[in-house]
Amino acid sequence: MSCPVIELAQQLIKRPSLSPNDEGCQALMIERLTAIGFTVEAMDFGDTQNFWAWRGTGKTLAFAGHTDVVPSGDESHWQHPPFEPIIRDGMLYGRGAADMKGSLAAMVIAAERFVAAHPNHQGRLAFLITSDEEASAVNGTVKVVDALMARNERLDYCLVGEPSSTHVVGDVVKNGRRGSITANLRIHGMQGHVAYPHLADNPVHRAAPALNELIATEWDRGNDFFPPTTMQIANIQAGTGSNNVIPGELFVQFNFRFSTELTDVLIQQRVAELLDRHQLNYTIDWKLSGQPFLTARGELVDAVVNAVKHYNEVTPELLTNGGTSDGRFIARMGAQVVELGPINATIHKVDECVSAADLQLLSRMYQRIMEQLIA
């Protein structure tokens, strides 16, 4: 298939950029962007490659994304090697095809076409690209945003190319995301022999009622923009592996995906009150991964909705569900942030794939968004 979007997507997929490694993906993008007049600034931190690129001045529309991918798993389960992209029955197969090298290719080709049609565009077109979104996300977008904010860079609109769609391209657009906070809880007891429980203090038994209450609690009811806050236990560990030893400690890790009805501070307070009420001897550490954010209807949302309607004749559903994305960092700059990308049915799975026609369509949507906001 001779199509610049598909050809670039295949070139990117061929590079096994397991997070946080980039494996030359960004160099490929930078070469294309500099050829059409972009200024590119490498902003590497630690083991992570990032770049910030821009062309023009004025109101800024940035396209954000990541070149890293998750591991492929057992490659023998794939119908075709994950880093040897192939098109079969109109589908482009390969690790990162949907998440999110297909989007990156669509963005770059959209920029090339936009600049060719509008060489003297009025606003500023920018790219914020990282190689660490799938793993720790410590040295990626968050560090670039910190650096840009420190020098008072302006960002008005940001389109994140995460795979947002469900059935057809653009049927779902993410105009916000829930916050995420994780608790690492340790319940302290006293180790002993299972035959002499009166000489020990079993932290599993002590914690069970509190954990049941954590699970049963309605944290909030959500609102017009966010579903209710959820709490899920992710890991539990106790014991020595022996069937005759009462454990001395219980480790429980649980995560909240929270709406704007709550704050991370309120969550921590409510959990502490619950644990104290059950008279547990515990220590707890919290890790905040991101605050919730929301982009209300405005110029960016309207431009995205218009582009999707124009090319796919569907009205996007604006949702805030799902996992976190780097949009949570970019929103700190005061920018309107929206996620629009391909269908997410196969992301992180064996035989990850995306419709080649969908990527072509997505690139046209991206171009139309550019034309509406900064032409």
Swiss-Prot record:
It catalyses: N-succinyl-(2S,6S)-2,6-diaminopimelate + H2O = (2S,6S)-2,6-diaminopimelate + succinate. Pfam families: M20_dimer, Peptidase_M20. Keywords: Amino-acid biosynthesis, Cobalt, Diaminopimelate biosynthesis, Hydrolase, Lysine biosynthesis, Metal-binding, Zinc. Binds 2 Zn(2+) or Co(2+) ions per subunit. GO terms for biological process: diaminopimelate biosynthetic process; L-arginine biosynthetic process; lysine biosynthetic process via diaminopimelate. Its EC number is 3.5.1.18. Zn(2+) 1 binds at residues 66, 99, 162. Zn(2+) 2 binds at residues 99, 134, 348. Pathway: Amino-acid biosynthesis; L-lysine biosynthesis via DAP pathway; LL-2,6-diaminopimelate from (S)-tetrahydrodipicolinate (succinylase route): step 3/3. CDD domains: M20_DapE_proteobac. GO terms for molecular function: acetylornithine deacetylase activity; cobalt ion binding; succinyl-diaminopimelate desuccinylase activity; zinc ion binding. InterPro entries: ArgE/DapE_CS (IPR001261), Bact_exopeptidase_dim_dom (IPR036264), DapE_proteobac (IPR005941), Peptidase_M20 (IPR002933), Peptidase_M20_dimer (IPR011650), Peptidase_M20A (IPR050072). Its cofactor is Zn(2+); Co(2+). Catalyzes the hydrolysis of N-succinyl-L,L-diaminopimelic acid (SDAP), forming succinate and LL-2,6-diaminopimelate (DAP), an intermediate involved in the bacterial biosynthesis of lysine and meso-diaminopimelic acid, an essential component of bacterial cell walls. Belongs to the peptidase M20A family. DapE subfamily. PANTHER family: ACETYLORNITHINE DEACETYLASE, N-ACETYL-L-CITRULLINE DEACETYLASE. HAMAP family: DapE (MF_01690). This is Succinyl-diaminopimelate desuccinylase. It comes from Pectobacterium atrosepticum (strain SCRI 1043 / ATCC BAA-672) (Erwinia carotovora subsp. atroseptica).
